[in-house]
Every structure is written in C-alpha cells, then in structure tokens.
C-alpha cells in the first residue's frame, strides 16, 4: 500500500501530492507552511501550488503557528475539520485525545488563557499531574497545551472576524479572552495584524442581518442524505425541522450555557455536498456563544470524521458504507433522555413520548421560523417534575425513574454528557442509574460522547448482519470477537450494520429506536 493510501502515517511526499491535487480527503489532516511567504494553508487551498522545497508540513495548526507561520487568508485554516487520533489501547494517546477534546470545546475557554492554571485544571480533570500532561502533550503534538489552546481560540476569533458583524470586543469575549487588551496582544503577536486590520474586507449584507452565515467543512465521502434521514425520522416538531431531500438541511432551536449564562435561539443548516461544506446561520441571540454552537454542530453531523482511517478498517466488511457518519446530537442530555424513552419500543412510539414530554415541560421560544417554537426540557425541569405528570404522558414507572435519576445526576454535576467525558467512566455511571442497561449506555456514548468505539452489546440488527442470530449468549461473544478488527471504529461499524440490514438504509423500524 502506498503512503498516500495509509490513513494514519502519510509521509511528506504523499502530503505534497495531496496538496498538488487539492485532495479534500486530507483537509485538516495536515497543513502546509510555505517558507517563501510565511503562510500556512489547508491541502485544499486554491492558490498557486508552492515548490516542494519551500514546503514544510505540520499535523496541527498550532505547530505551524509555533514555528512562526501565519494562517492563509484565502483557504482559512480555521475552517478545516479537526484532526482526531483515536486509540483504545495506548494510554498516552488516550490521555492526549481527552486533553484535546477538552481544549477544543469553546465552553471551556472563558478565562482559560490565564497561564498555568488552565493546565492544572485540565490535568486535575484527567487525574494526572500538570507536569505529566505537559510532557505527554508536547511529546505527541510538539506544542504545549496552552499553545494548542491559544491557536484554537485565535482561529475561532479569526473566523468570527471574517464571517460576522460582531464588535471586536464581543469577539474577544466569545473566543475566551478575559479582556480586549489580552486579545489584541495575542492576535497581533501571532498574526502580525490587529483584529481590525484582519477585518479589512467589507462584510456582506448577509453578515449584517439576523442569522449570521458561517461555513463548516468536512472530509469526503459523506452520505449527507443518509444522516438526515436518520435525524428526520426522530425529529421533534417545534424543536427541529429536518430536510432529508434537496435542499438538504436542518433547522432547530438551541440552548447553550456558558460562563454562568444561558443563551437560547435557533440555527439553520444548508448542505453543499459538492463543495464538502455546509452553511450555518445562527440567530443573533447565540452570537456570544458562536464557537460553542459551531463545535456542537460539528458534533451533530460528525463533520470531523476521518473517512480514510475509518474505511481502511471497515471497507472490507461494509463496502457500501464508506460515506456513512455516526449521527451525533446538539445536546447530550437531550440525546440521553430520548435514548431512554426509546428503550424496547419503536422509533415512532419513542418519538411520540418525546413530543409529549417537550410539549409539557419544554419552554416556548419566539423565532422567525414558524416550525421552531419550543426548547427541549432542561435537566432541572425533568428532575423536579412530579412522576405523576410523567405517567400522564404515557411514560412507565421504570422509565420515569431512569429519566429523573439521569436528570438529577446532570443537575448535580456528577454526569457530563459531551465529547470530553471519559467513555468507560460515563457508561459505568449511566449503568449505575436505574433502568439503564449496557445497550443504552453504549448508544449514548456513541452519539452524545462522540466515542468512535462504542459497542451496543447484543444489538439485534448487528447480530443479524453478522449472520450469528439464534445462538443466544454465544452470539454476543462471537460479535465481540468479529468486532476486534474494527477497533477503534466500532461505532461506525454499527451504523453500517444497521444500514446494511435493511433495504431502506437507516430508515426502517427495525433499526433501534433512540
């Protein structure tokens, strides 16, 4: 196999070939720094291809910026999909991937550039010393955790400068800087321009109306329609509206908590599969938390997936599934509630219960979109509601106990349901709650925690796909054995198995209901 086709170990010559061909499959997997200009670019950049001897290659934008290169204003490295290195065996790799997940989450950014306190806080959450974290991080990525974080924040600010009409002071706060002075200093030191100079191009009329447009990119292939069909079958009226046919898109209401404040509003997405991108419009009310909204939307649509790595492990067994992604969620608590409601019933029945719950406990919201007028219930609302009310909605007692135990755990802070949470610890915590078994816990890990190696034990559709139904407990053991070759991408294997089991991929009631 040539270096170009090896997903996790391409050499510089293969990178240069990808650059010459503007290969979108490598977008975000490396950046090219040009020594003659001092600029670094994405592989898809359409400027004149630099000479090979003038190119240096970096795996992360933070590495290029540490070496003194500035981001290209044309291809805009801040728009590239994020790079993920998943492992289920290497403890150091697992530590680094957990650290980068935390640093990538904009909800952890406010005030986070205040020196070593950030590293100490992160290390404490990971259960290691800050010295050990810095050493492992620098060994694996070539930059310190603070350097990585600063690059992520500055690139987010750069995107807002280019795509929104937000005042620079608000951009500084939204990208996690404690003051405008700190922001201006960091921006100027890194990019050689002030934020005002970076925003030299006049904003379009679209950027100055409610619903700020933002571009988000992905690596192909991506079967957008399949993912939207999955979401459309489960959509909740008033909260979301999914368009699985042209024009491909989604609209939904949103709630984001950040810095002790709650922001509510709406967003709308339109997909452009030919350009490997989507257009995201966000209500003005969500602009103060725009980086967090972008981060969640990327998770919802699995935009940072690495198809080359995934397909290298799964294509032989699932050749028709190369474009399938794992549907994520915008809010982990909402996903967990809907997963519990869907236990042992059909998709349609689970959706009916979720609609009733939303109509009874969800808050009303005013938007310019007639189909969007309600927010999903908060954990506090569900934790405090009378079980009798849940019973009136048709939710049986066992599910009531599971839902309210989940809600209380989230309210008390003992349960975190996002991509930073450790998959093993969180699934164990979920299973310790009444009425939540291994299948549901793994399903939540797959979609809310964005864990690529989730494995819903005993999944009927999966066992049928593997041709081992009718063997009782032996079937689950055999499924585990066969799945070893798919690690660390078993979540994607599950999605492909569900699609391959039915004539209408991902859309029939035979697919698990949550």
Residue ranges and their predicted role:
Residues 1-514:
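HhH-family (HhH-GPD) DNA N-glycosylase catalytic core used in base-excision repair
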């Amino acid at each position: 196999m040539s270096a170009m086709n090896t997903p996790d170990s391409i050499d510089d010559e293969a990178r240069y070939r990808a650059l010459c061909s503007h290969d979108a499959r490598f977008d975000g997997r490396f950046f090219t720094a040009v020594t003659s200009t001092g600029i670094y670019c994405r592989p898809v950049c359409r400027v004149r291809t630099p000479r090979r001897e003038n190119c240096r290659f970096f795996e992360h934008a933070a590495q290029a910026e540490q070496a003194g290169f500035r981001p290209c204003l044309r291809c805009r490295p801040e728009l590239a999909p994020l790079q993920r290195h998943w492992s289920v065996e290497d403890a150091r790799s697992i530590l680094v991937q957990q650290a980068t997940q935390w640093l990538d989450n904009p909800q952890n950014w406010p005030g986070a550039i205040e020196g070593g306190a950030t590293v100490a806080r992160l290390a404490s959450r990971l259960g290691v010393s800050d010295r050990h974290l810095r050493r492992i991080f620098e060994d694996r990525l070539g930059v310190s955790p603070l350097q990585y974080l600063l690059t992520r924040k500055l690139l987010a600010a750069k995107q807002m400068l280019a795509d929104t009409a937000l005042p620079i002071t608000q951009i500084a706060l939204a990208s996690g800087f404690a003051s405008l002075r700190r922001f201006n200093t960091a921006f100027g030191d890194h990019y050689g321009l002030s934020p005002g100079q970076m925003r030299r191009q006049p904003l379009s009329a679209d950027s100055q109306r409610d619903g700020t447009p933002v571009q988000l990119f992905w690596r192909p292939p991506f079967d957008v329609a399949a993912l939207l069909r999955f979401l459309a079958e489960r959509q909740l009226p008033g909260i979301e509206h999914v368009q699985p046919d042209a024009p491909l898109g989604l609209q939904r209401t949103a709630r984001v908590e950040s810095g002790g404040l709650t922001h509510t509003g709406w967003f709308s997405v339109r997909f452009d599969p030919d350009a490997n991108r989507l257009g995201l419009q966000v209500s003005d009310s969500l602009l103060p938390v725009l980086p967090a909204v972008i981060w969640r939307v990327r998770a919802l649509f699995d935009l940072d997936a690495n198809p080359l790595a995934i397909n290298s492990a799964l294509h032989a067994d699932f050749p028709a599934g190369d474009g399938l992604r794992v549907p994520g969620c915008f809010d982990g608590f909402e996903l967990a509630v809907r997963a519990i409601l869907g236990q042992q019933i059909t998709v349609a029945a689970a959706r009916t219960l979720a609609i009733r719950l939303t109509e009874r406990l969800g808050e009303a919201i005013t938007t310019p979109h007639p189909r969007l007028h309600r927010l999903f219930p908060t954990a506090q609302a569900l934790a405090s509601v009378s079980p009798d009310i849940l019973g009136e909605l048709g939710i049986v007692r066992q599910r009531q106990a599971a839902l309210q135990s989940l809600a209380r755990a989230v309210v008390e802070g003992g349960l975190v349901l996002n991509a930073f949470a450790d998959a093993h610890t969180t699934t164990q915590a979920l299973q310790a709650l009444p009425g939540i078994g291994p299948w549901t816990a793994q399903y939540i890990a797959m979609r809310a925690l964005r864990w690529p190696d989730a494995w819903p034990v005993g999944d009927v559709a999966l066992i049928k796909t593997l041709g081992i139904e009718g063997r009782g407990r032996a079937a689950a053991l055999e499924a585990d054995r066969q799945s070893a070759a798919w690690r660390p991408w078993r979540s994607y294997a599950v999605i492909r198995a569900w699609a391959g089991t039915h004539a209408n991929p991902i859309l029939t009631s035979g697919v698990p209901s949550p």
